Each structure stands twice: as C-alpha cells, then as structure tokens.
Amino acid sequence: MATGLAVAGFGAAKAIASPIMQSLLNNLGEGGIFKMFYILAAVYFVMMFIGHLLLAKPADWHEPQTKAAGEGILATLKREPLTSYIGIWLMFYLNITCGLALISQEKMIVKCIGLASSVGIISTISAVFNAGGRLGFSAWADKMKDRNTIYKMIFILSIVFTAAVMFTGGIKNGDGNILLIILVLALIFVVNAGYGGGFSNVPTLLSDHYGMGSISAIHRITLSAWAFAGLTGNQMASAIVNHTGSFIEVHGVKVNPVGYQNVLYVTLALYIVSLCLSLFLVRPTKK
C-alpha cells in the first residue's frame, strides 16, 4: 500500500491539475499556453524542492542486502527462471499500452456518447479512479500470498468490460442510450483503475521475486516497459482512429465512433495476452 500511496500522485495530479490548467488557459489570453507552463514550472519547482528536503531515511534503518557483492543485474534475474521476469515486463508493458490507448481517446469517446458538456467532470472522475486504483489494488495485493494474483484480477476486469462495450457497440450506439453510456463510462473508469493498479504493484511484485536489496536496479530496468508503452499506446490508438472508420459530427463535434470501437478490438486481444502471461509465465514466489 505504501507504494500505491506514493504513486497515487500520478492519478491525483490529473484530477487536481487538469481544471487548474484549463482555468489558466481560459484566463491568460494570448500566449496562454507558454504562460501556463511558466507558472506550472515555478509551482512545481517549489513543491518538488520542498519535497526533497522532507525525504530522509529513518535514523536506525539499514537497507537489506540480499544482493551478493559484485552480482550483476543479469545474475540477479537468474535467481528465478528468466521467463518470470520476461512475463512481468511484458504484462506491465501491455497493461500500460492498453491503458494509454484508451485514455488518449477518452475525451473524444465521452463526446461521442453525447456527454461533451461533461468531459471535464468525467476526466476528473477517471483521474480519481486512476489514483484510487493505485491505492486500492496495492492495498488489496498486500493481503494476497502471491501479488501476481492482483494482475490476474486487473486483466480479468479489463477483459470483461472491454468485451462488453465491444460486443454491444457501446461507443457507436451510446448516444442517447443510458445503459450503454453507463457501460462505456464503467470501461473508462475500470481501465484507469487497472492502469494505476498495475503500475503501483510492480515494485512489490519484483521485491517478492528478487528481494528488496535488488529492487532499485530491477525496477529501473522494468520501467523501460513504461517508456516503450508511452511510445506505442497513444500512437497505436491514433493510427487506428485515423485509418479506420470515418469522422462524423455528433452534437457539433467531429468524432469517429467506429475508430474508437476498433481500438477496443486491439486492447481486448492485448489484455487476453497479458492474462495468459500472468497465468502461465510469471511463476508464483516460493514464499
């Protein structure tokens, strides 16, 4: 849960900063974008500088040394079957890719189902789910013998809601249909929560497999999955939306319902692959 609390700031920041940024853009006039970034840079600098001053190790705490002297990162990974680490890296990458694919199209999907006037509110709620997923799933995982179980839960939930929206055509047919609107919003919130929960549980999953003494080096390498997902998730969704379906006008907004639906076909397949990795490639810990 401590890890979840630490990284919940990612989701909470979206909920807090989005309306502030929008307000700044609306009130700063000409050149509002670069003025906004100057203001945010100053605020973030002060907050981060104060934050780093408050960080300190407890006086009597000593870092556990489970890593042998001179042991390289590859030797550390080989303490367990290397396929376990490959599975962890891949399912982390795929979960983030799927999350970013949907989140990057979130506002347009909301407009597509007829809620253009509520985009800001829904974006804030989804950010709360993002932060809540980091806290909730990490706290839930603390009660599990094998932390990989939480990933199985995340992937199953994501598969169920993605499939439900896909097979009902929720995005294409949601405008004016309250049940489909609720289903599409539920998908957005579940994916945001799973995106956050998958991120927050990686350090503890790695520590269970390789020990706290090696966590910094292994976590550093594992975060490359996040970087690669950042390069592929948004671009994948944009490519699908721009090259499939067609843009139409809904309540004065140009959207591509078929394109957004097609994104779900890809994310559903990737979530199924992720679940298979979690089930068959990531070995349970010996604890």
Question: Could you describe each region identified by the protein language model?
Answer:
Residues 10-59:
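Helix-loop-helix hairpin linking two adjacent transmembrane segments in secondary transporters
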Residues 17-18, 81-138, 199, 203, ...:
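Extracytoplasmic gate region of multi-pass secondary transporters
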Residues 48-56, 197, 227, 260, ...:
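Multi-pass alpha-helical transporter architecture, strongest
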Residues 149-165:
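Structural signature of the two symmetry-related core transmembrane helices
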Residues 1-2, 197-210:
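Intracellular juxtamembrane helix-capping segments at the cytosolic ends
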Residues 23-42, 239-270:
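A membrane-interface helix-boundary motif in multi-pass transporters
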Residues 56-74:
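Flexible cytoplasmic inter-helical loops of multi-pass small-molecule transporters
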Residues 14, 209-246:
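A late C-terminal transmembrane helix in Major Facilitator Superfamily
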